Amino acid sequence: MTIAARNRFIRMGALVSLSLVIAASAGVAYMTLKGAHPTGQPGPRGFALLDGFFLTPFSPTAAVLAAGIFPFFSLLCLAYVLFAFEKTQTIEITFFAAAAFSVSLESLRVLVPLGELVPMARISPVFISRAILFCRIFSTLSLLASVIFTTGQTAQQLGASVFLIGFFSFSLVTAVPFNAARLYSNFLVRPGFTATITVFLSVIALLAVISYLIQGKTRAAGDYTAAGFALLAFFAGYAILSYCDSWAFLCAGGFLLFSGGWQYLDRIHRYYLWQ
């Protein structure tokens, strides 16, 4: 994939993310103006112990806002990539841009409560949950690939690699069963084999972080090591916002997601600036 082709795809992704920002903002604003934010808990919480903790009371508004944060994060990341890496061919940034774009699909969660007010926006929660599981698998695998392929993958094969990751993620998601009757407090239907999927994503995320730390030590590059820790913050923020149903989760997850993404891009930019 040439730099020009990569930049075209990133611009398209940025436009889609901008569209999702506008759509999610409009949905949240509509519910706010109508005074129709969800008032009840749509289902059990991801962590039942949170019900008894005074810092994490259930807030449906926080759950809706958490979903709306993701496309804004994606748009900022893609804009940074276009500005700082417009003429730089970097394997890491190509995969990170793909991951950042896929994260914007988390905003589809807004359609679940919005669908109760606007019939045209009503989409099956199972379909939305399946699409979001796809973006979580795809983004995690892309970030692992961003460090693995730097050891030998050529820039011309990046397009095919991203496609294969997308195909694998789609195939995996279609094989996972969903029970439409199990809507949780974050407006998602929990998939079957939840524990297995959680362990799988956690292991892939940790492998990505560890791989960056190893590469940083091997190359004697402090910026690469810092990028690994930034990814750890990104994954932590992503996980927290994925289960977000309280204001404490919204604040903590948002801070980790944005600070991790910013630090990762900044450190990779510094690394290539001195090459």
Predicted features along the sequence, with ranges:
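The cytoplasmic-loop to transmembrane-helix boundary for the fourth helix
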Residues: R11-S19, V147-V176
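Alpha-helical transmembrane segments in multipass membrane proteins, preferentially the mid-helix core
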Residues: L75-Y80, T140-T151, L172-R182, T194-G222, ...
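Hydrophobic alpha-helical transmembrane segments of multi-pass membrane proteins
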Residues: R45-G46, I69-Y80, T94-E116, S169-T174, ...
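Membrane-interfacial loop-to-transmembrane alpha-helix junctions, especially the N-terminal start
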Residues: K87-S102, A155-G166, G216-F229, A248, ...
